[in-house]
Amino acid sequence: MEISGHTRLLCLIGSPVAHSGSPAMYNYSFEKLGLDYRYLAFDIKEEDTKKAIEALKMMNFRGCNITMPGKTVAASCCDELSKAAQLTGAINTIVNEDGKLVGHITDGTGWIRNCLEHGFDIHGKKLVIAGTGGAGTAIQIAAALGGAKKIAIFARKSSPRFANGEETVRKIREHVPECQAEIFDLEDAESLRRELTNADLFCNATKVGMKPMDDQSVIPDVSMMRPELVFSDIVYNPRETKLLKEAKEAGCKVIPGIGMLLWQGAEAFRLYTGQEMPVREVQEQYFSE
């Protein structure tokens, strides 16, 4: 489809963005469905995020994705936030609804959909989630809103981000009281073992397992891995982290992180266009080994 005066524009903003596969994935999907959209990427430093979003609004862009480091700043630029975005305090997607900028966070919904695609439904389940950074917080909030029964959050007490986890627990207790939420020190192996004993799923939402930490795992002892426990990792490079390799060897079902990347993009696509991304074709084209 040729670009015309009617073509709606979308983009990715953040820094760096040159490596991003988003433009290829979205433009392929638009072409596949015959939609008159184009998707670009702009390298925008955190301090310029507000100006960039104002410019996109002025030029009537349909919306944008935000990657690091501007996710928190971007939330403050919106006229309205989804419930998950309000509680997370950050966004990765803005949709321009006739001049009103609506902020969304699709990281958590992408993770939930990835779990579903691997046969795991979080509803009514107990989840143990390590990590209190942006992705971890988004997953914890989305899981609480999505019907998880209990969420045990683990983070290193010595880290400044432990306070993020405490704040997430407070928000879940206040806004989603039907979901039990607690936080523990990740360096307390006994607490981790105890919480895993009756958990349904463990998720690594830290950078452990990613290079240069690809020889490490957040689970210090493989005896904590019982076959009934599902293991999820948000790290997608390498595709099979040490955590997932050891979990598989212990007879556990594993959920690799690459699917979360795909499904968070698919959710943003739906918000932009009102249509479903051609996920199977995109998966084959851009996410196959």
Residue ranges and their predicted role:
Residues 66-73, 134-135, 207-210, 237:
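Short glycine-rich anion-binding loops that position phosphate/pyrophosphate groups of nucleotides
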Residues 3-4, 122-123, 145-147, 219-228:
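Short, conserved loop/helix-junction motifs that constitute active-site signature segments
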Residues 148-176:
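NAD(P)-binding Rossmann-fold cofactor-contacting core
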Residues 14, 105, 124-145, 155:
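Glycine-rich adenosine-cofactor-binding loop
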Residues 178-254:
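Rossmann-like adenosine-cofactor binding region
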Residues 228-230, 234-289:
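Adenosine-phosphate binding glycine-rich loop
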